[in-house]
């Protein structure tokens, strides 16, 4: 829970709060015990739980894409096609980049990314991804690489 008093909280950057008790377990639990000064966003009962559950990963995806400054001439590579990566894929399309390439080891997720419009989807267990990206971009590579696997080895 952000303290609301430190430098970062005063700037609205609650995720950088200096308070050592800033992170509590159970964010996706049905019930949680919170301090009375906690920032709480109540989800309306008319929003289905499945849709409400996507608010957090999609907000992360939107924020990440917005931070890139992505434009129409960019080749974008998104590594990791789970909820956050698929969100990045969709938000990237709103920026109309030159091409979006997805990377994942899960063939089912690769197929979904293709159906959503990825120009190419690569599986690092089946091909040398860097070489293939260089082939697809005439040796240029990508302007924007977005990591959504959570695996340090993929960065």
Residue spans for each PLM region:
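Short glycine-/small-residue-rich Rossmann-like dinucleotide-binding loops
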Residues: 1, 149-150
